[in-house]
Curated annotation (Swiss-Prot):
Substrate binds at residues 102, 105. GO terms for molecular function: histone deacetylase activity, NAD-dependent; NAD+ binding; protein-glutaryllysine deglutarylase activity; protein-malonyllysine demalonylase activity; protein-succinyllysine desuccinylase activity; zinc ion binding. Binds 1 zinc ion per subunit. Its EC number is 2.3.1.-. This is NAD-dependent protein deacylase sirtuin-5, mitochondrial. InterPro entries: DHS-like_NAD/FAD-binding_dom, NAD-dep_sirtuin_deacylases, Sirtuin, Sirtuin_cat_small_dom_sf, Sirtuin_class_III, Ssirtuin_cat_dom. It comes from Bos taurus. It holds the Pfam family SIR2.
Length: 310
């Protein structure tokens, strides 16, 4: 039988955005710790001792590379919020519009590069691996910037902009074409005055498996869909092993990912939050470092004086 908290994660395995925590007020009080520290020297002591580090990343780290977050007052594509388009219902209703939205996102990401935060994580992972220590990255992002930075041990829990899934045969495939199909060339402009292209469904991305030709969809987790149970089990395993957790650029409001770090903290494991602002989970963590991840992470993850040179 799986551990109790993986069962609990499954209960919350539908993707929600902007919802208040389902944890009761009484439980919140029990989980709340003293005000988190911003003492980098103290964090570095924890970092030097850690053998199995888990990094949980969200949209904030990629925003520093110029990737739109689709959150807050400016979080619109044309007149739509991401929550309006990133659903199975929206795709069934208007696959052309949804593919325009994702084509725009693919094109934006293909023109961006990993920032100093991504690179610091990847370099730290490679360096500690040579020392027999582990760094695992669990990301909510679908932009593959961690992968582009060189991160190897990576769990992309919400999928990838650069993978497709056939709605007929179910095959998942990598796809880095630009544009992904000829009909989307020059489409997807985010301006509110732009009219939908109204691309016929037969001209949208199609499956290339022999004898199929089914309509493709982005291989991402949409609002209202379940996360892959196999990935959640991998996440559960890594969180159970970790002795230091970093929460990087995440708002801590999207479930089930918002539960991961507080659960680790409840076991007494040090958790450090790196973000531009505080979040609903900040008070549960031992450390909080405010500012751009590209500034705070390189200092936090730099080689410690106790590390062996390799």
């Amino acid at each position: 039988m799986p551990p109790l908290w993986i069962i609990r994660n499954r209960l919350f395995s539908q993707l929600y955005c902007g919802l208040k925590s389902p944890v009761s007020t009484q439980t919140k009080i029990c989980l709340t710790m003293a005000r988190p520290s911003s003492n980098m020297a103290d964090f570095r002591k924890c970092f030097a001792k850690a053998k199995h580090i888990v990094v949980i990343s969200g949209a904030g780290i990629s925003a520093e590379s110029g990737v739109p977050t689709f959150r807050g007052a400016g979080g619109y594509w044309r007149k739509w919020k991401a929550q309006d388009l990133a659903t199975p219902q929206a795709f069934a209703r208007n696959p052309s519009q949804v593919w325009e939205f994702y084509h725009y996102r693919r094109e934006v990401v293909q023109s961006t590069e990993p920032n100093a935060g991504h690179l610091a994580i990847a370099e730290c992972q490679a360096r500690l691996h040579r020392q027999g220590r582990q760094v695992v990255v669990i990301t909510q992002n679908i932009d593959e910037l961690h992968r582009k930075a060189g991160t190897k041990n990576l769990l992309e829990i919400h999928g990838s902009l650069f993978k497709t899934r056939c709605t007929s045969c179910g095959v998942v495939a990598e796809n880095y074409k630009s544009p992904i199909c000829p009909a989307l060339s020059g489409k997807g402009a985010p301006d509110p005055q732009t009219q939908d292209a109204g691309i016929p469904v037969e001209k949208l991305p199609r499956c290339e498996e022999a004898g199929c030709g089914g309509l493709l969809r982005p291989h991402v987790v949409w609002f209202g869909e379940n996360l892959d149970p196999a990935i959640l089990e991998e996440v559960d395993k890594e969180l159970a092993l970790c002795d230091l957790c970093l929460v990087v650029g995440t708002s801590s409001v999207v479930y089930p990912a918002a539960m991961f770090a507080p659960q680790v903290s409840a076991r007494g494991v040090p958790v450090a939050e790196f973000n531009m602002e505080t979040t609903p989970a900040t008070e549960r963590f031992r450390f909080h470092f405010q500012g751009p991840c590209g500034t705070t992470l390189p200092e936090a993850l730099a080689p410690h004086e106790t590390e062996t040179v390799s």
